[in-house]
Design a protein with these regions (language model features):
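Mature, structured domains of secreted/extracytosolic soluble proteins
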Residues: 3-9, 16-18, 22-206
Length: 206
């Protein structure tokens, strides 16, 4: 019988016509810039302590949104989550802030910037380095590998490969050093790459 070849031919014709009719713009959209990544991962203060609302607000307050939106940039950015900023504020202003909501933590970050203008910019630039460092590289470098940040200070990377993370040693010897959050690695952008981290990197000993 010739029914099976006819069905196959008809199916091929339908497939070919569908492909031919697909619009040229149907290709996958390019990834967003680092600013777009941060906008997508953050927003207004909410009840989720493990996104990046407070960092997004800090970037805006520090006037760094355009730098992260620059298509010519080529950066690795470490993203402290909201809980990381809560820990920073509690360390600066007292342990009662462990019971505060995100909006209150944000108000204290604004207070910090008001009392010492440029502080947020300094801190945020300490979280960015030139070039793209993916998690595979971060987990394979020698322990204590230095990275020079855009702020000018140094962060040292020490892999803990069996846990799928790395510790980032900052300039504050008395705090808990942040580590890469395994579920927030290799967030791709058109102008760089980002990794979530557990605490805020500190460019000075607080």
């Amino acid at each position: 019988m010739k029914l099976r070849p006819l069905i196959a031919a008809a199916a091929s014709a339908v497939l070919f016509s569908a492909v031919a009719a697909a619009p040229a713009g149907a290709a996958s959209a390019p990834p967003p810039t680092l600013a777009g990544v941060l906008d997508a991962q953050g927003g207004r203060p909410d009840h989720n302590w493990y996104d990046f609302d407070l960092l997004a607000a800090g970037v805006d307050a520090a006037g760094l949104s355009e730098a992260l939106d620059d298509p010519a940039a080529n950066l690795t950015v470490f993203l402290p989550n909201d809980r990381a900023f809560q820990a920073l504020v509690a360390d600066l202003y007292g342990p009662l802030y462990w019971f505060a909501d995100e909006a209150t933590i944000l108000s204290q970050l604004v207070r910090l910037e008001t009392s010492a203008p440029g502080t947020l910019r300094t801190v945020i630039l300490y979280h960015a380095v030139s070039g793209q460092i993916d998690s595979k590289t971060a987990l394979s470098v020698p322990s204590g590998t230095p990275l020079t940040t855009l702020q000018g200070g140094t962060v040292r990377v020490s892999p803990v490969a069996w846990l799928g993370t790395a510790v980032l040693t900052d300039a504050d010897r008395n705090d808990v050093d942040p580590w890469l959050v395994p579920s927030k690695l290799d967030i791709r952008a058109s102008n760089g790459i980002a990794h979530g981290i557990s605490f805020v990197l500190r460019p000075a000993d607080l």
